[in-house]
Amino acid sequence: MAERARIVIIGGGIAGVSALYHLAKMGCTDVLLLERDELSSGSTWHAAGNVPTYSGSWSIMKVQKYSAELYRELAKDKENPINYHVTGSVRLAHSNERMAEFKHVTSMARANGMEYDVLTPKELKDRYPLLETHDLVGALWDPLDGDIDPSQITAAMAAAARKLGARVRRNERVTALKQHANHEWTVTTDKAEIECEIVLNAAGYRAGEVMALIGRHLPIMTMSHQYLITEEIPELEARGEHKLPLLRDPDTSYYLRQERSAFILGPYEWQSTAMWLDGIPDQFANMLWPADIERLEKQILDAGERVPVLGDVGIAKVVNGPIPYAPDGNPYLGPERGMRNFWHCNTFSFGIAQGGGAGKAIAEWILNGRPEFDLWSIDRRRYKEYATTQYTVDKALEVYQNEYAMGFPFEERPAGRPSYMSPLYDLLKSKGAQYGARGGWERPTYYDPKGEVTDHTLSFFRKQGWRKVVAEECHAARNGVAVLDLPGFTKIKVSGPGATAYLDNLLCTKLPKVGRLSLVYALLPDGKVLSEFTVARIADDEYYLVGAASSEWHDLDVLEMALPTDGSVTLRNVTKDYGSIIVVGPKSREVLAKVTTTRSEEHTSELQSHSDLVCRLLLEKK
């Protein structure tokens, strides 16, 4: 007879154990964690253990802040000792652009209750006396940064979860997953069969293998990431217990951390390598790859100039281990698209910093229906079918190489593109369209038909080279007419005898009359916005919903999970069946009059109305 648990967690790294701990802490103790090897034996055990709160993402900053707070609290438990050092950190700025970024993130941190500060070179030297500062503009100070022993914090959370009644089984491999008509699961392992309501995939770099058990693809790849530990340095030994702050030099792409009387140097180099493209070895627990020190030469030399005591010190050890990456470097949290009771908490490139907060968030999401704060930037459903294995590898390598790069507004990185294109793509490109990507779709960001934009330098100071041509486009849209090709908007048809009642119950805004448009919202019980749609009412029981390109899978879940079971409502995803051409400006009516078989004056000029216009679109042929 099969055993039973409400929730089965697959994976015993810091993310899975944190989820176990937080589920139990919230009162759900009927949880079983299955680990194929030993706890923390995948990517967790060899992690450097840095615990930054810094992030350019509001939601990730919140996740990391909670992790730091949780670890400080757990470190007080004398039964499960944890080596946790809160040293603070300095991030170096070589330019005014970098200082502008630091000031922006400092304001975010202060809004989140953290006392970041921006330092002058002199103030920086006071905090880090071994540092060469003559060519620096300044630095950012994060007082909460530090480092922790990854295996110890994982073991401490596992022990706390067990005390609360949760279960952990090691050396037990999941071999099959089967979902039943009632949306519950049978989890088959090499030792048992377990019936459960919910499966949580927390399998780290093996999360894609778990997805294969349910016949689905996860955009994940494995990166080779290295850090080195130096031999002992007398100047550090002389400092005694006065440990230096963690140092990050983003403009040369490395971190430097005091480890007893030595340094740990962790670069994010341009020559990183995608691993295991043909599959993950069956056995790799607590294992590493051979060192590839040549890849790190530039960062080693730069660090030696920045902190001269590194000098000619020798290298005691190199750690070269596997780290999972999504195409944007962010983890996957939340439900699997179109599938009840299957959840994600995996693919952490910065698992120690994010593991504590991610465990809290996924526990809240599973038990309460939503986490405390918005997590769209790490929602599993942000990536759709276009995120193939090759796309994932290309984008992840690009992200790794730019790990410390400045996050400029309007930056468009080229790797993995194009994926989805409008039928007008080639025509508009020949007319000077410069493209960006939204939800996998190529969209023109501006036009440069005369080749006027020669300076493509990115900036925080509104000095972008495209400002002049964009201003001309805005002037045309305000005073004449502009035609925009905006493909990729999520487009869903809702029809059937129950369609009106279904949408009226799901959406907070009054539904439009036939022939009219409304901007509508699906809300959470606490009033927060879940989805936004523009809805056109085609007939009494037929509606056309338009949503954001990037949220297609999310919005489909919102609609599908609320469908009545009596078959009275039909949903049809027509996102790829129709394009989106926007005609705007005071002279837009004149343009439409030339391409429609219906006189434009027959149509109302009110904003919230629509009509089916039969148009002829003449495309130039080369």
State where each predicted segment sits.
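Glycine-rich FAD pyrophosphate-binding loop
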Residues: 24-44
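Dinucleotide-binding Rossmann-like beta1-alpha1 core, especially the glycine-rich loop
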Residues: 49-127, 251-256, 260-264, 290, ...
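Positively charged, low-complexity/disordered segments
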Residues: 606-622
